[in-house]
Amino acid sequence: MPSARLQQQFIRLWQCCEGKSQDTTLNELAALLSCSRRHMRTLLNTMQDRGWLTWEAEVGRGKRSRLTFLYTGLALQQQRAEDLLEQDRIDQLVQLVGDKATVRQMLVSHLGRSFRQGRHILRVLYYRPLRNLLPGSALRRSETHIARQIFSSLTRINEENGELEADIAHHWQQISPLHWRFFLRPGVHFHHGRELEMDDVIASLKRINTLPLYSHIADIVSPTPWTLDIHLTQPDRWLPLLLGQVPAMILPREWETLSNFASHPIGTGPYAVIRNTTNQLKIQAFDDFFGYRALIDEVNVWVLPEIADEPAGGLMLKGPQGEEKEIESRLEEGCYYLLFDSRTHRGANQQVRDWVSYVLSPTNLVYFAEEQYQQLWFPAYGLLPRWHHARTIKSEKPAGLESLTLTFYQDHSEHRVIAGIMQQILASHQVTLEIKEISYDQWHEGEIESDIWLNSANFTLPLDFSLFAHLCEVPLLQHCIPIDWQADAARWRNGEMNLANWCQQLVASKAMVPLIHHWLIIQGQRSMRGLRMNTLGWFDFKSAWFAPPDP
């Protein structure tokens, strides 16, 4: 019998007997474990061989045998739990232990670095599952980061300095304002073994032609082997950077026929997905990666929803025991912000916008927050920390304003905290705030109407590219803000847009109201080398490494 199954049977027997040694019979024990008398005898003999108990059998009618426990079910359960942790079987661990506090304690104690059979393994604690990793779909901040570890694109953007670098394409050139040529590497392989072909690249780029920032791609052809020509309907100075974004990641052309591709995607990037469940994401270094092989062999993201309620939650590399240190911190390039929905009467009303912006000012929100949040929140006066576009102007409450609806996407504890503070402030002015939580996909599409929306945005480097690109790619914003987005996109592509002025106009009209910049923190011990936090609050797994243990 497999060891795990035998351990489960012993724990069950120990629990049924309440851990007490006793005189009993094979029939009684077999009834407890719902098995045959013969199988019960086999179990007892095997458990005795393992040193867990002794079974002194007595022969004869009416005679009772002696069962003595030498090992407790709790101790064996702990041992089994340790085995499951080492095997990264978090699903089974949760089922075995049951108690969330105990599971958390065990997970935290095993975070950080592990060196097993010559392999470097990094264990990370996160507050929610990362089930959708499909490029081109609605991806949140962390999913965007993970997708970059799994997939490659024609170009890539250096996370530290925002500079454009080669990826699948080793060189490129602009033939004319409407014609770009990219030269691709041969010998690139997908995680499932197949070699990348030009048809994969063409199919991947054509599938995103419906997205606003890629809608100007008129044609994609390969005139010669490993050469890709992209023809545009309008000039775009940002095209090479655009092709390094997550929507433009390269997928196998048969991706739609592959099982559960969104949660178990196949790319050509430095890491391949091994497991992705509600309790764990495991990615493993791809030995056939065309670039430098990752130095960390395996990354396990363990999911523990309970840490979502901790203000500094998010990403945890090392547990609080011992010498815990803050590895990296940075003020996010972005903010929480209010978005007024021009589709509703109250959302479009300028008096409502002015008054709500006044009473829900950044300083008010921070003032009414608990101290643990005040340490991590910084009042925002622009979409970026360096901008001071918003001015707090005293405004009178509009007559007849009695209620407002606020909507945000779920699985984000700080949304609830901020919304609760808003509800408290508005209630003091006799305004009821109705709060709605919807899925991230529903939020992204923006087909639901709400007076105001509570959103957050994290912009990546280079900011003069990503800020407009991010805002333009969220359909919700285009539904709520009635400006000529296509005309603005054309100006942006031509390099004719003053981005700071454009954002200032959105803030001045109260279409968007910056609220809070958040400090991004990675918690842990300084045992890892090469860790550089990016603007998404994560770090490039393939660039980090551990010094090997002392011999």
Swiss-Prot record:
Family annotation (Gene3D superfamilies): Periplasmic binding protein-like II
InterPro entries from the UniProt entry: SBP_5, SBP_5_dom, SgrR_HTH_N, Tscrpt_reg_SgrR
Alphabetized UniProt keyword annotations: Activator, DNA-binding, Repressor, Transcription, Transcription regulation
The HTH marR-type domain, residue ranges: 1-116
Region (Solute-binding): 163-492
A Gene Ontology BP annotation from the UniProt entry: peptide transport
Keyword Cell membrane: no
Single GO MF annotation: DNA binding
Function: Activates the small RNA gene sgrS under glucose-phosphate stress conditions as well as yfdZ. Represses its own transcription under both stress and non-stress conditions. Might act as a sensor of the intracellular accumulation of phosphoglucose by binding these molecules in its C-terminal solute-binding domain.
Protein name (database record): HTH-type transcriptional regulator SgrR
Organism whose genome encodes this protein: Shigella sonnei (strain Ss046)
